[in-house]
Each structure stands twice: as structure tokens, then as C-alpha cells.
Design a protein with these regions (language model features):
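A conserved FAD-binding loop/helix module that cradles the flavin
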Residues: 188-222
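Glycine/serine-rich phosphate-binding loop and adjoining beta1-alpha1 elements at the start
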Residues: 1-28, 265, 269, 273-285
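Rossmann-like NAD(P)H-binding beta-loop-alpha module
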Residues: 33-63
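FAD-site-proximal beta/loop scaffold in flavoenzymes
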Residues: 15-39, 107, 124-195, 235
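Short hydrophobic core segments
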Residues: 1-2, 43-45, 144-152, 268
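Rossmann-like dinucleotide-binding cores of NAD(P)H-dependent redox enzymes
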Residues: 29, 55-102, 220-233
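N-terminal glycine-rich dinucleotide-binding loop that anchors FAD/FMN and/or NAD(P) in oxidoreductases
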Residues: 14-22, 26-29, 78-106, 113-119, ...
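Mid-to-C-terminal Rossmann-like scaffold of FAD/NAD(P)H-dependent oxidoreductases
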Residues: 99-105, 110, 120, 207, ...
């Protein structure tokens, strides 16, 4: 079922015209439904990779300015450092230690500004990240026309609540994909872990498939009709990853051309010789 639902902030004005959920916005753009951000002032709320995607996308849609608002420090953002640095190089401003308070709308119900509450970094929580708290300072008003909310994704597990156990809004399952106290039911992927990578979802699917096969009394061997060459068993020296170069950042704004320059033929040959395994061994039953 995937983690396709955007999380809400729960602040006043969140239903104003001009407030977008990041995942839905990015999906619409990918499917060809491109909004007109030309000349607009955009605020993006969040500090993860999705927020950076939304930020850099807004710049490519012609926004006059893009400000990313985050309640912790830049160093605490969960987005990849490369994404953060590239977004800043392309012209994004990151407003750190500011928590969304409310969204101001004009008389027509359109977004007029984002009000944020200054934060102070507090003690570290059980997740190893510092927990901010409200500073003794006045609210900050950031004029904007568009607000994009990118504070995470969630699944809608409510339809399954009557037939299987849930834990913190997700389907409860063990590492071998069995759902406890629910005979003949297996689960994996985002529905169990929450938002994660495609690789983890594929690995969970392989685990579930193998265990379902065994549960039904079979022991099928997966065969491929593609001829796989014999491996080279010699120990090759460690090989570093080819680092791609960016196009000049001023050329990236206003278009969706590739940011990374391609590899040479020699670099492609070297890169494709490196290990492509997911390193997921076993299915929990052997």
C-alpha cells in the first residue's frame, strides 16, 4: 500500500489556497501536471530529501524565491548533504531553527505569509537527535505565495486494523514477514517499516515470497532465463565510486535538464564492474 499519504502539520491556515503536499505535488509534476510558480515566493517546510526535492523543483518552475523552513539546525537535517549544498548553490535560502506556527491568508483565502516560531536546540532525545523548544522571541513573518509541506509520509493502515495488528500506524510484522497472530498473512515494505528505500521494499518482497512459498509446502528454486556469466573469483582491489560533476548551478534553474554530467565510456566500464549486490542474505527460514 506504500507510504503515499502526506503528514499534516496541524496549524491554522493549512487549508489555504496555495498550500501543497510535497509528495502529491511532485507526483503531479512527474505525470505532466505542472503548476505555474513563475514569479511566486515559495516556502518549503521540512528538512528531509523530499523537502529538498520540492525546493529544487520550485526553483526549476520559475519561483522568484524559495525558502526552506526547518525547526532544527541545518546540520540536523536528514536530507543528504549533497542535496542541501546543491539547493543552496541554486539559490535556496534555508531558514533554520524556525517552527511553523500558522499560515496567514488574504481576504480571498490565498496564502500571504508563513509565520514561524524561533527555536532553541535542546537536549538529545532517544532517537539521538536534539529536540528544539520555543525561544523567548517574537514570531517571524515570511511573505510567500506558496507553501509546500514536506514533513514526512505515512501509510493508511486503518482498513487493516480489524484483521491484523498495527503498531504506531503501521502493520506489525517480524523480520521474516510473518504477521503475528494472523495466520497465512505476510507483510513487508513501507507498510511495515514506514517510508524507506525501494531496495528495502524489494528485499522485503523477496523475503515474503520465499516464506510464503515455504509456508505453502513448496521449495521452489527461482530460475532465470537470462544467461549469467560465471563470476571472476580473483580478488580484485577495492575500487572507488566514480564521482559525477554538476553542470553550473546557474544553468540548472528554470529547467529540468540533468544536473549531473554523464560518464565517459571508460568510467562506465569501471563503474559497472563494481559490486551491484543488495547484500541481503537469507529469508529468515533457513
Amino acid at each position: 500500500i506504500g507510504a503515499h499519504n502526506d503528514k499534516k502539520i496541524g496549524i491554522d491556515g493549512e487549508n489555504s489556497v496555495g498550500v501543497h503536499a510535497a509528495v502529491q505535488l511532485l507526483r503531479d509534476i512527474g505525470e505532466g501536471r505542472v503548476p505555474d510558480f513563475r514569479g511566486k515566493r515559495v516556502c518549503v517546510i521540512g528538512g528531509g530529501n523530499v523537502s529538498m526535492d520540492a525546493t529544487r523543483t520550485a526553483l526549476r518552475l520559475g519561483a522568484a524565491s524559495v525558502t526552506c523552513v526547518y525547526r532544527r539546525r541545518i546540520s540536523d537535517m536528514t536530507a543528504l548533504n549533497e542535496e542541501i549544498e546543491d539547493a543552496q548553490a541554486e539559490g535556496c535560502q534555508i531558514l533554520q531553527l524556525q517552527a511553523p506556527d500558522h499560515i496567514e491568508a488574504d481576504e480571498n483565502g490565498h496564502v500571504a505569509a508563513l509565520w514561524t516560531r524561533p527555536q532553541v536546540i535542546g537536549p538529545y532525545g532517544s532517537d539521538g537527535r536534539p529536540r528544539p523548544y520555543d525561544a523567548d522571541a517574537p514570531l517571524l513573518r515570511t511573505p510567500c505565495d506558496i507553501v509546500i509541506v514536506a514533513i514526512g509520509q505515512a501509510i493508511d493502515a486503518r482498513p487493516f486494523a480489524q484483521v491484523m495488528p498495527l503498531e504506531r500506524g503501521k502493520i506489525k510484522a517480524s523480520s521474516d514477514a510473518f504477521v503475528p497472530n494472523t495466520p497465512h498473512v505476510f507483510a513487508g515494505g513501507d507498510a511495515v517499516t514506514g517510508p524507506a528505500t525501494v531496495i528495502r521494499a524489494v528485499a522485503a518482497g523477496k523475503v515474503a515470497a520465499a516464506n510464503i512459498d515455504a509456508h505453502l509446502g513448496f521449495h521452489h528454486v527461482i530460475q532465470s532465463d537470462v544467461e549469467i556469466p560465471a563470476p571472476h573469483l580473483t580478488n580484485l582491489p577495492a575500487c572507488g565510486r566514480i564521482e559525477l560533476h554538476n553542470r553550473p548551478f546557474e544553468e540548472c534553474v528554470g529547467n529540468f535538464e540533468l544536473v549531473k554530467c554523464g560518464m565517459t565510456e571508460q568510467e562506465v566500464q569501471q563503474e559497472t564492474s563494481r559490486c551491484l549486490r543488495c547484500d541481503h542474505f537469507g529469508y529468515g527460514i533457513f
